[in-house]
Amino acid sequence: MGSFSIWHWLIVLLIVVLVFGTKKLKNIGSDLGGAVKGFKDGVRDGSTAPADPAQQVTANKSADANTVDVEAKQKS
């Protein structure tokens, strides 16, 4: 009772194809594959060691030449 035979799974597959159609199942499969690929790429990119944080800060400061550095003063 706990396991299903191959015939049960084939009948379920046939019903799913009849309900959703092959085109929609193809779209779902390609979307799922794209999501898995994106996840793997994200994990692979995240595993590389980041550069020195001090170098990142100086690179950001040089890129923001129009930014004005101000300091807020409290009223007495």
Curated annotation (Swiss-Prot):
Major localisation: membrane
Protein name per UniProt: Sec-independent protein translocase protein TatA
Compartment annotation: Cell inner membrane
One family name in Pfam for this protein: TatA_B_E
Keyword Membrane: yes
BP GO terms, sorted: protein transport by the Tat complex
Listed GO MF terms: protein transmembrane transporter activity
Name of the coding gene: tatA
Subunit structure: The Tat system comprises two distinct complexes: a TatABC complex, containing multiple copies of TatA, TatB and TatC subunits, and a separate TatA complex, containing only TatA subunits. Substrates initially bind to the TatABC complex, which probably triggers association of the separate TatA complex to form the active translocon.
